[in-house]
């Protein structure tokens, strides 16, 4: 069996990290197994779906490096859904219902007030032809429900283990709206059968939906003479750092927002691939590495929490491992046309975001007001500063001479030099940064002048 999985977002908002977990888990599963990855837009919610959100989803996937083998758009497949509906009607598995949304809400409220589950009472099945004709004469148009067969619905979930539902505890799902358009529960199953999806890996908020869809898969396979029931896996949903739920409309956790904040795609994928698993969370330098290490069996059942600080740590790890050639064009996009390998190697260990390189470029090349605490110390350091050209040994020789002249050592030696040369208490190693600053600028700063 060739593994086939899918990522099927609705273009009704920006992708967030919860969506990323679904996309990445499916992508890694497919690549590890040598299978195929389908990117499908579930865009039948025409009121809320927009081309802008569809384009943003594609942009996010490309930014992450999650390529796809096949693409589908549900709005292109209405004719296929009509055929599936006709087959289910012929099989007697769909029935028309005429309750309004208000009437259904009243039924639901009444059941809940009695402490009973809000399961649809199948009142529509008791309507006769005359009743239906009368309701339609009043202007009502039916929505169509899928009739669940009585009995136990079971599957072996790759993450949750054995799952079991009684059909009597579930409402017959609405598959067709009053205007004739199909709903997700139907379109998703039809697509999964047509594209021969072997594994459906998604969030645990779909578990009850899966129970319904298992019967729908079976009914369609019977009615159309093809297809079967895929293997299911339901992973826990991600919470925020404080345990709060996430939404794709929560802007701070959207992939676009994270990208704009300077998050590296490999850092994000490394974090999300390991979050909630038994693996240590460390950065990987390629998606191929993540795929080779991926194992669905390592995914736990507890609720993982998304920690921005942990992501920042991995972001730094990814940047610190990048050669200059990998970031050269991105540095140019930041306006650092003169950046070279020496600059990158000097500042790389101190970056948590690539944009931080701009700050250190300005330290090395732009006017800066130094911080001088002891003018005599700074004057001695300036007097002892060697002539250029400078090499790797220049910093050590210079600081040794300053130490001998002033008696300063340790922090009392190095911090005043750093403040004078960079106006900062922390930063890249000065033995690599000093040659970038240059002797002329260094002398001016040691004398207290802006340079």
Curated annotation (Swiss-Prot):
One MF term in the entry's GO annotations: ATP binding
This protein's GO CC annotations: cytoplasm
Top-level taxon: Bacteria
UniProt key word Transferase: no
PROSITE patterns: AA_TRNA_LIGASE_I
EC number: 6.1.1.17
Localization (cell): Cytoplasm
InterPro entries: aa-tRNA-synth_I_cd-bd, aa-tRNA-synth_I_codon-bd_sub2, aa-tRNA-synth_I_CS, aa_tRNA-synth_I_cd-bd_sf, Glu-tRNA-ligase_bac/mito, Glu/Gln-tRNA-synth, Glu/Gln-tRNA-synth_Ib_cat-dom, GluQ/Sye
Keyword terms of this UniProt record: Aminoacyl-tRNA synthetase, ATP-binding, Cytoplasm, Ligase, Nucleotide-binding, Protein biosynthesis
Predominant cellular place of this UniProt entry's protein: cytoplasm
Residues binding ATP: 248
Motif segment ('HIGH' region): 9-19
Regions that span the bilayer: none
Catalysed reactions listed for this entry: tRNA(Glu) + L-glutamate + ATP = L-glutamyl-tRNA(Glu) + AMP + diphosphate
Motif stretch ('KMSKS' region): 245-249
GO biological process, one term: glutamyl-tRNA aminoacylation
Record-linked NCBIfam families: gltX_bact (TIGR00464)
Protein's job: Catalyzes the attachment of glutamate to tRNA(Glu) in a two-step reaction: glutamate is first activated by ATP to form Glu-AMP and then transferred to the acceptor end of tRNA(Glu).
UniProt subunit comment: Monomer.
UniProt record similarity statement: Belongs to the class-I aminoacyl-tRNA synthetase family. Glutamate--tRNA ligase type 1 subfamily.
UniProt name for this protein: Glutamate--tRNA ligase 1
Source organism per UniProt: Rhodospirillum centenum (strain ATCC 51521 / SW)
Encoding gene per record: gltX1
